[in-house]
């Protein structure tokens, strides 16, 4: 865990630069930032970024910086142009495996900060922006790995050679608005809400992304507003693509039928040739939560398996049973007990 400690913040003068310090801390792998002067506007700005773009970053202003720095149980780093070269100490700090607090000053830093710090670290001994210094330190600390981390938020930016490619993971109300836009019935709404409740309960027992599971569960049957057959998953995925919904949610919707449909079987069923077997934990959770409901009525695994076998779908019944067993193992509890 890395925390950033911003001191000597002057709300009416430093708001923009401290905002950038916080944004850099979040984007480059820190888990929180503490600011000495109380600044509610700054807190609101950063919290809004976290809400929209994801992550678990935390901000708190109005802290006693000396107490926070002195009492920190880990390695205390002070970034300063007068310190030891970054390249001489970063490996030692990283390999300690301890939590790190990085002090980043605004105006002149009190000498007491130098005395409390375990490491006074210099990114360069030339004048440099504290934003740049923090970014370089974090990048060296994580050895560039932080650039490969992916945040999951309402707004997700995808790389593109030109222009802007942004896709959305809607919150619960956004999902319901989308369903109503396409004319979802009360029956359908009640069904997806029931599936969502179970899916989220399962997800909380795993490392699954709750936002993806919530959106995928609520939108999994949006295709049923247009068609009622097995193609509703593909139709629903197409609707979401047109609506600019995140690809990971689209994939959950596209792969939620039973415990999945393999490409050879898909062609026989009249679906576009593709593999519709759930692969991510989020896809598996939503698919099986849907299996365990008929409308808003909860079913046990045996009821689901028996229903499939009565229709002559022995292979599908077996896949559902295997998925049930797998997820039960993951959460350490029989899915029927949730």
UniProtKB/Swiss-Prot annotation:
SUPFAM superfamilies: alpha/beta knot, HD-domain/PDEase-like. It holds the Pfam family HD. One of its GO terms (molecular function) is tRNA (cytidine(56)-2'-O)-methyltransferase activity. InterPro entries: Alpha/beta_knot_MTases (IPR029028), HD/PDEase_dom (IPR003607), HD_domain (IPR006674), HDIG_dom (IPR006675), tRNA_m1G_MTases_N (IPR029026), tRNA_mtfrase_aTrm56 (IPR002845). Its main location: cytoplasm. S-adenosyl-L-methionine binds at residues 79, 105-109. CDD domains: aTrm56-like, HDc. It catalyses: cytidine(56) in tRNA + S-adenosyl-L-methionine = 2'-O-methylcytidine(56) in tRNA + S-adenosyl-L-homocysteine + H(+). GO terms for cellular component: cytoplasm. One of its GO terms (biological process) is tRNA nucleoside ribose methylation. It is found in: Cytoplasm. The keyword S-adenosyl-L-methionine applies. Its EC number is 2.1.1.206. The keyword tRNA processing applies. Gene3D superfamilies: 3.40.1280.10, Hypothetical protein af1432 (1.10.3210.10). Keywords: Cytoplasm, Methyltransferase, S-adenosyl-L-methionine, Transferase, tRNA processing. Residues 188-295 form the HD domain. Specifically catalyzes the AdoMet-dependent 2'-O-ribose methylation of cytidine at position 56 in tRNAs. Homodimer. HAMAP family: tRNA_methyltr_aTrm56 (MF_00077). Belongs to the aTrm56 family. This is tRNA (cytidine(56)-2'-O)-methyltransferase. It comes from Thermoplasma volcanium (strain ATCC 51530 / DSM 4299 / JCM 9571 / NBRC 15438 / GSS1).
